[in-house]
């Protein structure tokens, strides 16, 4: 099983951990739904920047 850590950042701010143990990532327009292995959901507004499947990391540019 491949689970991801999702990091987000706003312009001129440090990157922060948004969610951990993410099994599903569902883009919905300007929103991104993140579902973890326990079924908990986190919704963020932003744009996907990168996905590194080897390191299990996802980066999102968060809306201001």
For each predicted feature, which ranges?
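Context-gated lysine
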Residues: 10, 30-31
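N-terminal acidic leader/helix
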Residues: 1-23
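Structural recognition of beta-strand segments within beta-rich domains
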Residues: 24-27, 33-36, 41-43, 51
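C-terminal structural segments of small proteins and small subunits
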Residues: 2, 10, 40-64
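Short beta-strand/strand-turn micro-motif
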Residues: 16, 20, 32, 42-46
